[in-house]
Curated annotation (Swiss-Prot):
UniProt subunit comment: Homodimer.
Gene Ontology biological-process entries: protoporphyrinogen IX biosynthetic process
Family: Belongs to the class-III pyridoxal-phosphate-dependent aminotransferase family. HemL subfamily.
Name of the molecule in the record: Glutamate-1-semialdehyde 2,1-aminomutase
GO terms under cellular component: cytoplasm
Organism of this sequence: Caldicellulosiruptor bescii (strain ATCC BAA-1888 / DSM 6725 / KCTC 15123 / Z-1320) (Anaerocellum thermophilum)
EC number: 5.4.3.8
Residues where N6-(pyridoxal phosphate)lysine is found: 263
Length: 426
């Protein structure tokens, strides 16, 4: 596979953009190949400027659940852009989008922002304002965006790259505990009695690789928060509208006080949201005294793309069952391939998101994820990409499927994975 044009553009870009990218994980820093410079996407395919075609299992890090450039989403955006781009003023589509999100995700109220980071940042500020407490509990390996308070023992690119330590003064009110470990949580509450405003968690972690929370863990976490007057925040930036219309909450039957959204909610455009119980949400300005603002928040183009996406998900009763069937096929056939190759591995999958871990048989938290064979995963990722299967370059990111993928696409993934295993036996 040739990447001559991509290399030229990428090298030139580094003169003007630090590292050549606007988000670190895109740089393929842990691989020996140049990141393909993408020029087009359609369905589950993306194309680079060198003319290479890939089956995409990254999907803009999970955002493109309908596939790239879904016609209904594109047409809705075209209709709007003729008359509306951004006003910094109320628009009718904000109301329609808010109503759709609240009814579909079963929350009382929602506030739109511009990214998942803004959503989690707003949720924590709101929790502190509502409870009058200062500290938050987060889990090692969970990634809640690039705001300073969340970068303590975070997943995603933070785990992969050697990054400068953040100012300890900024994170002094951030308590980090172990994912899926109730003793760790109970110890934090015991040592910080009446000081914890909220616990924030990815109910299915996606940035230490895919690692689902245990059902009983989330249930007891809900009870602990109730007991101590702390809010429970589900970060569903990845899982919101991906695992079901109600996100991961439908899988666990656990209701948080606040939930954050991103990725899918914007239909592929920059968008985030925080939603939840009315009595808490009404603390946001201008109704309450917890400040949040954004010039581009709720702009008509983003709202239109998000509305078209969620409406399409809602109107297709077989959407999630079809995705489950396809992802299940991928998991089953990969399991067979790796087993036949006598590899030690585990595949963590929830719905249409999954991660392959080599060198370990079980991954339930960040420490276990870090014990996996990172070098073998890098070799796997590089081999897959060179053979036109676009997967994350990092062990600590998830793979995703979309409605645009077919059984043939899954079979091609499995075929290349089998070739990779054969190459390792030589």
């Amino acid at each position: 596979m040739r990447l001559d044009k991509s290399k030229e553009v990428f090298d030139n870009t580094k003169r003007y953009i630090p590292g050549g990218v606007n988000s670190p994980v895109r740089a393929f820093k842990n691989l020996s190949i140049t990141p393909p410079v993408i020029s087009k996407g359609k369905g589950c395919r993306i194309f680079d400027i060198d003319g290479n075609e890939y089956i995409d299992f990254v999907l803009s890090w999970g955002a493109m659940i309908l596939g790239h450039c879904d016609p209904d989403v594109v047409n809705r955006m075209k209709e709007v852009v003729e008359d509306q781009i951004a006003f910094g003023a109320p628009t009718e589509i904000e109301y329609k989008m808010a109503k759709l999100v609240c009814e579909t995700a079963q929350i009382d109220m929602v506030r739109f922002v511009n990214s998942g980071t803004e959503a989690t940042m707003t949720a924590v500020r709101l929790a502190k304002g509502y409870t009058g407490k200062k500290k938050i509990v987060k889990f090692a390996g969970c990634y809640h965006g690039h705001h300073d308070i969340f970068l303590k023992e975070a997943g995603s690119a933070v785990a992969e790259l050697r990054l400068k330590r953040i100012d300890e003064d900024i994170v002094q009110n951030t308590i980090v505990v172990e994912y899926n470990n109730l003793d760790s949580v109970e110890k934090a509450f015991k040592e910080n009695k009446d000081e914890i405003a909220a616990v924030i968690i990815e109910p299915v972690a996606g940035n230490m690789g895919v690692v689902p929370a245990k059902k009983e863990f989330l249930q007891v976490l809900r009870e602990i928060c109730n007991l101590h007057g702390s809010l429970l925040i589900f970060d569903e930036v990845i899982t919101g509208f991906r695992l079901s219309l109600k996100g991961a909450r439908a899988l666990y039957n656990v209701e948080p006080d606040l939930v954050t959204f991103g990725k899918i909610i914007g239909g592929g455009l920059p968008c985030g949201a925080v939603g939840g119980k009315k009595e808490i949400m009404e603390c946001l300005a201008p109704q309450g005294n917890v400040f949040q603002a954004g010039t581009m928040s709720g702009n008509p183009i983003v709202m239109s793309a998000g509305y078209a996406t969620i409406k399409k998900l809602k109107e297709n009763p077989h959407f999630y069952s079809n995705l489950e069937m396809l992802a299940g096929k991928l998991e089953k056939e990969l399991t067979q391939v790796f087993s036949n190759s006598n590899l030690t591995f585990c595949i963590n999958r929830v719905g249409s998101m999954l991660t392959i871990f080599f060198g370990v048989e079980k991954v339930e938290n960040f420490e276990m994820a870090k014990m996996s064979d990172l070098d073998l995963f890098r070799s796997f990722a590089e081999y897959m990409i060179k053979n036109h299967i676009y997967v994350p370059s990092s062990q600590f990111e998830a793979m995703f499927l979309s409605v645009a993928h077919s059984e043939n696409d899954v079979e091609k993934f499995v075929e290349i994975a089998e070739e990779f295993c054969s190459s390792k036996r030589k």
